[in-house]
Amino acid sequence: MALIKVRDLAWARMRAPDLDAMEEFLTHFGLTRAARTPTALYMRGTDPAHHIHVTEKADDARFVGLAYHAASEDDLARVAKAPGASAVESIDEPGGGKRVRLREPNGYQIEVVWGLQALAPIPVAHTPMNTGVEPLRRAGTLMRLRKSPTPIKRIGHGVLGAPKVSETVRWFRDTLGFIGSDDIYVGQKDHLIGSFNRCDCGDEYVDHHVFFCVMNERAGLNHVSFEVPDVDAVFKDHEYIARLGKYEHMWGVGR
C-alpha cells in the first residue's frame, strides 16, 4: 500500500547561473513571473497556483527535482516517515506552505507540498471553435492568432530518464501513490523500458499521466510539459519561439 496519494504535479525545480536569461526564455515560452528574489525565480501559469516553475541561481545549470501536491496536511506527516525523508518543514520561499523533501532512486529531489498561497487566475481570451454548425459557427467573424506567446495554463507532467526504470517506478507508486496507466516493455513484461503513471484521485478524472519514466543509460530530466488553451497555441507558439532565433529546437512541435 502506498504511503500517500498525491493529487497533482506542483512544479519543476531547476538551477541556472543567469536568472535574467531564464526569465526571458520562460516568458517567451508563455509563463509569467510570480516572484523573484536575488537567488531564485518563480514563474506561474494562468491558473491560481502561485508558481509552477522554480529556478535557483547557481554556478551550474541542472535539474533539481519535482514537487507534488499532497491530498491533505496529514499526508505530510505520513510521507515524512519514508526512508531518507526530511521532517515536515515550512517552505521559506514565495508562496509559503509546508513540505517534505525526499530523494527518488536516481538521486533527484522530490517535494511533497501543502498549503501554498493561491493567486488570482489570469484571464485569457478564448476564440470559440469554428465547426460550421451553430452555436459554434463563427459566421462573419475573422480569426487572428496573437503573435505573442499564449499564456500557459498549468504544469502537466514530468519525465525522467533512468537506467533502472522498474525500481524508479516502484518508488513513485509506493511512496506517492501513482497508478500505472500504460507500461512499455520489450520482449518479456519484466523488461520495462517506459512507464506512464497518473495520480490516484479515486473517482475524480485525472490526466493520463503526471509522471513518465523512460529507460536511459544516464539518469536525468527528459522534459516537463505545460498545458495551453488549444492546439493552435501549440503550433503558433512553436513558430513564435523559432522566429526568435535564440533557442535550440529539440524535438517535434513545442519542444
Label each PLM-derived region with a short phrase.
Residues 7, 15-20, 38, 67-151, 195-196, 244-255, ...:
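Vicinal oxygen chelate
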Residues 44, 56, 103, 198, ...:
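Residue-level detector of conserved, well-ordered beta-strand and adjacent loop positions
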